[in-house]
Design a protein with these regions (language model features):
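Core dinuclear metal-dependent hydrolase active-site scaffold
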Residues: 26-27, 144-175, 180
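C-terminal regulatory/interaction regions
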Residues: 254-311
Length: 311
């Protein structure tokens, strides 16, 4: 089952909050809670409104967990710090370095502004839920996470799993008793209405495929995605991962076949970027075309094919 409309409780230990486009997950057990995902800046005011309405006490939140250091996954962290005083921020070493880089966060604020305007325009948030401008271009991390670490929330214990491929800093988290997996972006941008994916192996095709297969083998029964949905039920989770893996492989094949047939890399990036832009439109066309150029580069590198770098 695809769950797409927060705020909603998913079992007794998990709340899907934030917006459908940028969900925030609140895990709770034994009188304490943790927030997973750092969202766009508007997720701060949205989350505050939601937890107030749900009667969740801010002092219960003891940890703020970042899945990876991209602008749509870290920009609400400063608001979360204020909302949950004393709660440490957890992220990978690479994500921590990015989040502490003023130049990177300065760029992120521009992306965040565009995403905020898009959310307002589509009615996902109100004007009053636009976050104030950043006063400091750094987002500090208190605890660095790595493969094999554990995050404890009451009696729940989440295994930290390095899942590179979308980014080198991507982490996923799995609670084996409740069978909850929080998987960030590595499995692709899933569109529940059509049950299709836009693969996002922005750093490495092979690693992305391996990470997705590793997550598929966990036996999760609840999969919390970085965008658009939570997948519940063992059978639907199995189908989700099968679809994600097939989508990654098919997109890769499409790229390789097109280039081998003589398609210019720049033209292909333009075509692929226009396709996904038409489906989401969250950022300007050239943003998606540049990201598709990364997918082309990584697919061709995997095949050992050298061509002119697509622009």
């Amino acid at each position: 089952m695809d769950i797409t409309n927060p705020p909603i409780a998913i079992g007794s230990h998990l709340l899907m909050l934030g917006t459908s486009d940028y969900p925030i997950y609140l895990v709770k057990d034994g009188g304490e809670a943790a927030v997973f995902e750092g969202g766009v800046s508007a997720c701060g005011p949205v989350l505050e409104r939601q937890i107030t309405a749900l009667g969740v006490a801010c002092e219960l939140v003891k940890q703020i967990v970042v899945t990876h250091g991209h602008p749509d996954h870290v920009m609400a962290v400063p608001a979360f710090r204020k909302m949950f005083p004393g709660a440490p921020v957890l992220a990978s070493q690479i994500a921590a370095a990015t989040m502490g880089n003023e130049k990177a966060i300065g760029f992120f604020t521009k992306i965040d502004g565009a995403l905020t305007a898009w959310l307002v325009g589509k009615g996902a948030i109100t004007e009053s839920e636009k976050a104030p401008a950043f006063t400091e271009l750094k987002i500090l991390v208190d605890r660095v996470l790595k493969e094999g670490d554990t995050i404890r929330v009451g009696g729940l214990s989440f295994d930290v799993i390095a899942t590179p491929g979308h980014s080198d800093c991507s982490l996923s988290f799995f609670e084996p008793v409740r069978k909850i997996a929080i998987v960030a972006d590595v499995t692709g941008f899933y569109m529940p209405a059509t049950k299709t994916w836009w693969p996002m192996y922005f750093t490495d095709y092979t690693a992305c495929l391996a990470s997705t297969r590793r997550l598929a083998a966990l036996g999760a029964e609840v999969v919390c995605l970085a965008h658009n949905a939570v997948i519940t039920g063992a059978d639907d989770v199995k189908k989700y991962f099968e679809g994600a893996i097939a989508s990654i492989e098919a997109y890769h094949k499409r790229i390789v076949d097109a280039v081998k047939a003589g398609k210019d890399g720049r033209a292909l990036a333009g075509e692929l970027g226009a396709e996904i832009h038409a489906k989401t439109g969250s950022l300007p066309l050239d943003f998606f075309q540049k990201n598709c150029s990364l997918l082309i580069k990584n697919s061709l590198r995997h095949e050992g094919i050298h061509v002119e770098k697509p622009a």
